[in-house]
């Protein structure tokens, strides 16, 4: 939360404080900038500057709203942290980043469309140039993020950057438009993290897609002690994907596998089928870890009939709750206040 400035001071202290203010310039305010590097075909969303003291805990940043400066397609994303000297900060200083399109809804629920999501174990996501997520000049995007610094070194003037490789709408060869989709083991528009009991455990959520289409790829995110994340077609009794995290020699998760179904023309998904996402954990600590578990899945989807993708329903209780959670920093289950929570727009349109 941004601290408020003290505006009324004892009169006797005013001269000394005024002199100090002249010699110590105020730290620049954190903000988000959106820019397009047309030569490199790189759309960049940058948040900063941030201060990351050594060993600092979780810091939920405000939900920043930005506007896309171009029309075209984006082909994946990557996240980087750069300090005030232009040097790369460790990837583990990023807890998570989410990019959200408030004018579009999700495939499995009424919540806002999650365009990109990354944790510290997320590798850069690169899509073939023949497919991409369609963006339009003036389209609003929201970026939510959490940072921390588990290292023994402080980092100053840090900037969090989300890079989107892109193709302009003027391109001769137009990519096939795809849409991201998101599923979570917690119900839509709720806290994403939950208490992790000791020993083996699992948690699931089930839902039906709003429209028919094909899954082109899928990946996911779990926390420490996570052993598997799975997507199933319950109706067909088949496992579409199962990912098991890679860990280092200390048991810390360093990456999650990603499945791609491009060359098989995708995995069919039907609205008359029920789908389940399941997270499995093996907590060997012997204690319940408050908010210690999470199971989130994201993928790429090509609808059979894009025009049938439902519009956002401004009156949906699910959407209103999602908007509030996004703007109070509680998506991940961490109790942090942040920014100013504006009311959701009265109407939305699809892109």
Please report, for each region that a protein language model flagged, where it lies by residue:
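Beta-strand-centric surfaces of beta-sandwich/beta-rich domains
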Residues: 22-214, 219-351
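Bacterial N-terminal signal peptides
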Residues: 5-16
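N-terminal secretory signal peptides that target proteins for export/translocation
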Residues: 1-3
């Amino acid at each position: 939360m941004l601290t408020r400035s003290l505006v009324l001071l004892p009169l006797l202290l005013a001269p000394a404080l005024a002199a100090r203010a002249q010699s110590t310039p105020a730290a620049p305010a954190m903000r988000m900038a959106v820019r397009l590097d047309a030569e490199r075909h790189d759309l960049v969303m940058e948040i900063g500057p941030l201060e990351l003291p050594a060993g600092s805990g979780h810091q939920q940043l405000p939900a920043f709203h930005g506007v896309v400066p171009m029309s075209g397609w984006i082909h994946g994303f990557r996240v980087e942290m750069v300090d005030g000297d232009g040097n790369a900060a460790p990837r583990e200083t990023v807890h998570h980043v989410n990019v959200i399109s408030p004018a579009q809804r999700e495939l499995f629920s009424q919540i806002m469309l999650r365009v990109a999501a990354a944790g510290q174990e997320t590798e850069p996501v690169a899509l073939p140039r023949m497919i991409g997520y369609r963006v339009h000049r003036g389209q609003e995007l929201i970026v939510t993020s959490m940072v921390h610094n588990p290292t023994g070194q402080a980092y100053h003037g840090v900037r969090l950057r989300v890079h989107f490789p892109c193709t302009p709408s003027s391109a001769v060869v137009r990519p096939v438009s795809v849409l991201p989709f998101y599923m979570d083991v917690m119900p839509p528009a709720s806290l994403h993290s939950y208490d992790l009991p000791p020993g083996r455990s699992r948690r699931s959520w089930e839902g039906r897609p709003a429209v028919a289409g094909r899954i082109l790829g899928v990946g996911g995110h779990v926390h420490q002690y996570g052993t598997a994340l799975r997507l199933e077609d319950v109706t067909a009794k088949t496992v579409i994907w199962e990912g098991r995290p890679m860990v280092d020699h200390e048991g810390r998760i360093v990456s999650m596998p990603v499945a791609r179904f491009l060359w098989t023309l995708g995995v069919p998904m039907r609205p008359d089928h029920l789908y389940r996402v399941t997270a499995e954990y093996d907590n060997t600590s012997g204690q319940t870890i408050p908010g210690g578990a999470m199971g989130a899945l994201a993928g790429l989807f090509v609808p059979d009939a894009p025009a049938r993708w439902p519009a956002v329903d401004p009156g949906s209780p699910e959407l209103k709750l999602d908007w509030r959670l996004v703007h109070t920093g509680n998506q991940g289950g961490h109790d942090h206040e942040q920014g100013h929570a504006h009311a959701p727009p009265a109407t939305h349109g699809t892109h």
